[in-house]
């Protein structure tokens, strides 16, 4: 998708469709200009209440041919009605407007469109013109996603390829361009994560993820990628990771990405993604119902790759390291058994009480590996526990941290992008649930506070740096009729990295 921001006249800009706005029952400048050319068509529609006053409502209009007209369709979009003078457009309005408009444009079989913003929002404050441009570009990108493997008429490719954001002056052009660039980059990153998440486990293997990282790095001089195999991990003493991958015919991979967009002396942020490309539960086998959704157990890894995709698109001025712990969790004669004791890279021993609590086993060695980068912060992202879904449902990711400033920054990023998280306790009181008679710790802590004890387990490997854990089990994918990966929390992560 190409986004262009420029100053233009609605009478002379060549495009298939012009998008104009109304607010408080009145046409905005470009809509009013179009109305004059169309002999009162738009004001007539307002007078008969053909468009709802609800923010995001829209009305398609077929335009009468004129001498100067270079477009045949118009889309009139409602910004909403203020109930009182102090009320204005809210962040929620911006999101609704953008989602509805993006969906409408992508389903209209248009090749291009032009959006006339007409200073619809102020340059400063919570709800700005840049925020509207950012959100609209992101939602247009998101609405354009089609799963690559699905064939047939139900998967018609999106036709919209170019959107012009039209400004009224040069300052507004810059504002719209900035908003469109960040929104489009985030949207591309989200879609990349969705695609990886949606791929079946027979295609998206640990090696496939490593190849995707390699391909992404090939297109950017600031990004490098490499992958460690099981022999290299064995030499590093990654017994926890290998206890998971050894049950599968697919070799486990520790995938490493380094994006160097800032000065070399600036400490990097590190993102650690759980990449269990299919999780059967191992010997502690999961029930058959809905097991197909365990292909989504690598959505943490997908979000890391999606975030790097966005950073590359933005040419971001930050240093970021990505570590993806990629493995399959399969039952076999070589798989780990309940009661096995393994030694992690940190030297701590773990009694594997349940082989279906495998995510923390691959992550703990990856978190230990992260120490070598002397990071500014480390954020791990994982579809870690069903207990988090019980606690928070499908709207907020669970957030745990050993450093409140990092937690606050992530919470703020989530609020700003509507990719929200909720901070959970990480108290020492929960640590004793991990006690083991045969090792330094067990890999599960019982049913009470299951998401918390999983985070407590990880915290034992993060003593040397500021760390946060995002449990995305409830937000990484949708089930049911709209089954599919969401691409979360790419927008949260990108916002966090750009602002910290």
Curated annotation (Swiss-Prot):
Instruction: Relate the protein's function as given in its record.
Output: Presumably involved in the processing and regular turnover of intracellular proteins. Catalyzes the removal of unsubstituted N-terminal amino acids from various peptides.
Its needed co-factors are: Mn(2+)
What GO cellular component is one of the record's annotations? cytoplasm
Q: Which UniProt keywords apply?
A: Aminopeptidase, Cytoplasm, Hydrolase, Manganese, Metal-binding, Protease
Give the cofactor note text. Answer: Binds 2 manganese ions per subunit.
What chemistry does it catalyse, as a reaction equation? Release of an N-terminal amino acid, Xaa-|-Yaa-, in which Xaa is preferably Leu, but may be other amino acids including Pro although not Arg or Lys, and Yaa may be Pro. Amino acid amides and methyl esters are also readily hydrolyzed, but rates on arylamides are exceedingly low; Release of an N-terminal amino acid, preferentially leucine, but not glutamic or aspartic acids
Any GO BP annotation? proteolysis
Q: Which GO terms describe its molecular function?
A: manganese ion binding; metalloaminopeptidase activity
Q: Which NCBIfam families match?
A: PRK00913.1-4 (NF002074)
Q: Where does Mn(2+) 2 bind?
A: 274, 279, 297, 358
Please state the Enzyme Commission number of this protein.
3.4.11.1, 3.4.11.10
Entry protein name? Probable cytosol aminopeptidase
Presence of the UniProt keyword Hydrolase in the record: yes
SUPFAM superfamilies xrefs: Macro domain-like, Zn-dependent exopeptidases
Q: Where are the transmembrane segments?
A: none
Family under the similarity heading: Belongs to the peptidase M17 family.
Q: Which domain of life is it from?
A: Bacteria
Record's subcellular location:
Cytoplasm
Top enzyme category: hydrolase
Sorted alphabetically, which Pfam families does this protein's record hold? Answer: Peptidase_M17, Peptidase_M17_N
């Amino acid at each position: 998708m190409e986004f262009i921001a420029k100053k233009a006249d609605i009478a002379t800009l060549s495009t298939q469709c012009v998008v104009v706005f109304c607010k408080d029952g009145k046409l905005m400048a470009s809509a009013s200009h179009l109305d004059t050319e169309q002999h009162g068509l738009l004001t007539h529609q307002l007078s008969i209440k053909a468009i709802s006053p609800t923010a995001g409502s829209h009305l398609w209009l077929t335009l009468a041919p004129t001498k100067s007209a270079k477009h045949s369709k118009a889309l009139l979009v409602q910004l909403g009605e203020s109930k009182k003078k102090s009320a204005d457009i809210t962040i929620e309005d911006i999101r609704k407007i953008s989602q509805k408009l993006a969906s409408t444009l992508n389903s209209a079989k248009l090749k291009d469109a032009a959006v006339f913003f007409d200073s619809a929002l102020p340059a400063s404050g919570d709800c700005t013109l840049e925020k509207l441009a950012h959100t609209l570009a992101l939602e247009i990108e998101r609405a354009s996603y089609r799963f690559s493997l699905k064939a047939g008429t139900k998967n018609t490719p999106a036709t919209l390829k170019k959107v012009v954001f039209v400004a009224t002056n040069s300052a507004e052009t810059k504002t719209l361009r900035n908003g469109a660039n960040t929104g489009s980059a985030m949207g591309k990153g989200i879609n990349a994560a969705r695609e990886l998440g949606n791929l079946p486990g027979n295609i998206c293997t640990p090696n496939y993820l490593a190849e995707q990282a390699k391909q992404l790095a090939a297109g950017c001089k600031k990004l490098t990628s490499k992958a460690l195999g099981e022999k290299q991990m064995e030499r590093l003493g990654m017994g926890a990771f290998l206890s998971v991958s050894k049950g599968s015919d697919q070799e486990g991979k520790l995938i490493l990405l380094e994006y160097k967009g800032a000065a070399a002396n600036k400490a990097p942020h590190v993102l650690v993604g759980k990449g269990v490309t299919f999780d059967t539960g191992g010997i502690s086998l999961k029930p058959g119902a809905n097991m197909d959704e365990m292909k989504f157990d690598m959505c943490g890894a997908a979000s890391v790759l999606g975030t790097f995709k966005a950073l590359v698109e933005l040419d971001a001025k930050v240093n970021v390291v990505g570590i993806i712990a990629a493995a399959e969790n399969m039952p076999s004669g070589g798989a780990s058994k309940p009661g096995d004791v393994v030694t992690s890279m940190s030297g701590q021993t773990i009694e594997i009480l349940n082989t279906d609590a495998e995510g923390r086993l691959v992550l703990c060695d990856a978190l230990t590996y992260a120490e070598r980068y002397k990071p500014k912060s480390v954020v791990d992202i994982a579809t870690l526990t069903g207990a988090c879904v019980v606690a928070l449902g499908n709207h907020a990711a669970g957030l745990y941290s050993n450093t409140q400033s990092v937690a606050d920054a992530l919470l703020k990023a989530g609020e700003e992008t509507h990719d929200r998280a909720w901070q959970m306790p990480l108290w020492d009181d929960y640590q004793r649930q991990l006690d083991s008679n045969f090792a330094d710790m067990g890999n599960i802590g019982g049913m009470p506070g299951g998401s918390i004890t999983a985070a407590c387990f990880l915290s034992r490997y993060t003593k040397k740096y500021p760390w946060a854990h995002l449990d995305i089990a409830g937000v990484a994918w949708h089930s049911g009729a709209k089954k599919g990966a969401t691409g979360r929390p790419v927008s949260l992560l990108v916002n966090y990295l750009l602002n910290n």
